[in-house]
Amino acid sequence: MRSPERVLNSLSEHSKDVSYKFERLYRILFNEEMFYVAYQHIYAKEGNMTKGSDGQTIDNMSLKRIEKLIDTLKDETYQPQPSKRVYIPKKNGKKRPLGVPTFNDKLIQEVVRMVLEAIYEGNFEYTSHGFRPNRSCHTALTHIQKEFSGAKWFVEGDIKGFFDNISHDVLINILKERIADERFIRLVRKFLKAGYIEEWQFHNTYSGTPQGGIISPILANIYLDKLDKYIKEYIAKFDKGKKRKFSRESLDFGNARKRIVRRLKSVKDERQRVKLILELKAIEQGRAKYPNGEEMDADYRRMKYARYADDFLVGIIGSKQDAQQIKGDIKNFLADKLALELSDEKTLVTHTERPAKFLGYEITVRKSNDQRRDKRGRLRRTYGKRVCLNVSMETVRKKLFDWGVLEMTNRNGKEIWKPKCKSGLIFNDDLEILDSYNREIVGFYNYSVSYTHLRAHETPEHLV
């Protein structure tokens, strides 16, 4: 019996050949050691001690239990139990559904997840940041800071009810492009069809992946990798021009400089030369105040893209018409190829001077005074735009809502936010209460300060 490390490494190596089709994957689930590793992965994770619909938790693991589970996989009598539907409160008073699988389902899902990750992770695009090893919200925001400078328009993408609207048939067909193992495919389909439990009533799910399911994130990325690759090809066709034309100001200063340099070559009088050198320095200083490139160059276009789960952001150096065309093309691709719908109310074409919302940040592109020296040592101003990230008030409020120190009421159709007592701390002494609040505030601040500063009226302590 091969070790899990060797099994997964072998899958990763074969995945480098994009034409390779994986067979006999289902047999990996007969390897007891795979289940030991899966158990180690999920045992300590928060939420895995939550009771599933079978009323069991993940503790009290036993070898006999694993052997029995493997036997049901071998004869394909294994049937996932309906996920227990847990509702997570949202700031508007509504609740978000979360499917909590049973213990056995969690264990098998983790083994399946490891197999799928070994096959697909190496071929995912660098523009995808959600639910991936060594990637996070931070890498997505860093990507945007580095690549979106100079963008003129944003397309804020939001896929309507993504997790609940994934087409099972489309997903299975995508998996079959790389996996030629019907038993493995049948197992994935079983998980997709497992349904959920709400108020102890069984409901079938004909689309969607439970958001609390362990394999949900990897399945979501496999599904939306099609979008990532479509946009990669789109960018290759959209981009044009090697660099921007010189701006009018840059050309004028450049011509003035050439005239002075020519005069310096012929002037012998020292006082006259000093005067010309001072003029030359003034020209260099003036030139550094303006961008070197033309802001709206019809022969220069660029498109950038970043995705985290079902949210994505597109940055465009081009016209508003270009941005609207891109939005329409993405909408058509999602509908035609992935059976998904863009949310019209949340998918916006926004000028980059106005904030676009992404991962709890308000993102803008603003003028910059950054300068650099060219290969001759002369100061040049860069294009003159940089990405600015600001934590939105909505994000701060949501964080306070999650802490349980803020509540919202609706008065005549208007949201009213009120402070709320954190009743779980009432038996603590004053120092313990302060320490609890400080840890939450410092943690949130450290997360946010990597990219921007919080204005005084937006800090958690101000609202608390």
How would you name each of these model-derived features?
Residues 2-214, 218:
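Conserved pre-catalytic core of RNA-dependent polymerases
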Residues 81-83, 307-309, 344-347:
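Short Gly/Ser/Thr- and Asp/Glu-enriched loop/turn motifs at secondary-structure junctions
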Residues 93-94, 151-153, 304-313, 418, ...:
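Glycine-rich, often proline-containing surface loops adjacent to acidic residues and nearby aromatics
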Residues 126-127, 132-135, 139-332, 338-341, ...:
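Conserved polymerase palm-domain catalytic core
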Residues 338-369:
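Conserved catalytic core of two-metal-ion nucleotidyltransferases
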Residues 376-449:
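Basic, alpha-helical interaction scaffolds
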Residues 452-461:
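Conserved small/polar residues in nucleotide/adenosyl-binding loops
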